[in-house]
Amino acid sequence: MIKLSNITKVFHQGTRTIQALNNVSLHVPAGQIYGVIGASGAGKSTLIRCVNLLERPTEGSVLVDGQELTTLSESELTKARRQIGMIFQHFNLLSSRTVFGNVALPLELDNTPKDEIKRRVTELLSMVGLGDKHDSYPSNLSGGQKQRVAIARALASNPKVLLCDEATSALDPATTRSILELLKDINRRLGLTILLITHEMDVVKRICDCVAVISNGELIEQDTVSEVFSHPKTPLAQKFIQSTLHLDIPEDYQERLQAEPFTDCVPMLRLEFTGQSVDAPLLSETARRFNVNNNIISAQMDYAGGVKFGIMLTEMHGTQQDTQAAIAWLQEHHVKVEVLGYV
């Protein structure tokens, strides 16, 4: 549905040349929810704006539903953009128009008959859970409700693609979850292809089928969400995954934790499990194989793309030789082990 090939985007600021995107290629199949994740300044907003040519690529090809957009005339591009809805971080609603009027605007600009506008807007507001807000103004809505209006407006022209530019970044966690569930429901109900950009791996984890990691204007990793969470290939992907799970060291352990080993101490470990290593009885196996005892301090597990992953804080009791052998064995079985210190 979306195929970006060798996209490069260069900005000129006076005598400075800034390369925002460098030879980026991305394929989003029809009906998928595809996430692009990256830190601020990585190029993700520029990338998503190249899809509908809000930013025209310096080089490269943009295919949407089989149509090459970069070669279209302005009138042809305007028509093609009706198939590409877009929502933004800051909603961009017209304060002087009601909820109904905001959603109706693209239909009015397209000279849609009034009775058809009324039918379509009513249908869309019901779909996004705002069936009772026709006559409300944006100033009377919560942030989540404003984004729902923006989603309804983006869907007014029956697009085949929805672009989401940090659509949940301005929302609180509970509202973010409700908006993501709405997008997932719309994707299932309408078969809509969704491309979203975000700096939060939680967003990717909740609704995306595939994910690409962008850094310094380049896609450094892309695969299914389950594969990236199970076998991240880059340090940046690993960092984003770690951000979705966090365990604080209990206060009593922090007081006793030493950086270097001392007499009668035991190592405190942070274990990261992904894919098959989550369900395998690896800690029990280390106890049998290496004569060590594992005391689990705390643990957290989650799912992404149908794959379970998690982290655990443990004490490993045993001789230095046995604990080192057990740690090496865990690492061989795809468990990431970090020695946090000694207690």
UniProtKB/Swiss-Prot annotation:
A GO CC term assigned to this protein in UniProt: plasma membrane
Binding positions for ATP per the UniProt entry: G38, A39, S40, G41, A42, G43, K44, S45
Record domain ABC transporter: where: 2-241
Keywords on record: Amino-acid transport, ATP-binding, Cell inner membrane, Cell membrane, Membrane, Nucleotide-binding, Translocase, Transport
Lipid bilayer topology: Peripheral membrane protein
Family: Belongs to the ABC transporter superfamily. Methionine importer (TC 3.A.1.24) family.
Leader sequence segment: none
Protein name, per record: Methionine import ATP-binding protein MetN
Quaternary context: The complex is composed of two ATP-binding proteins (MetN), two transmembrane proteins (MetI) and a solute-binding protein (MetQ).
Pfam family of the protein (one): NIL
Reaction(s) the record says it catalyses: L-methionine(out) + ATP + H2O = L-methionine(in) + ADP + phosphate + H(+); D-methionine(out) + ATP + H2O = D-methionine(in) + ADP + phosphate + H(+)
Disulfide bond annotation, renumbered to this chain: none
SMART domains: AAA, NIL
Species lineage: Bacteria, Pseudomonadati, Pseudomonadota, Gammaproteobacteria, Enterobacterales
Role of this protein: Part of the ABC transporter complex MetNIQ involved in methionine import. Responsible for energy coupling to the transport system.
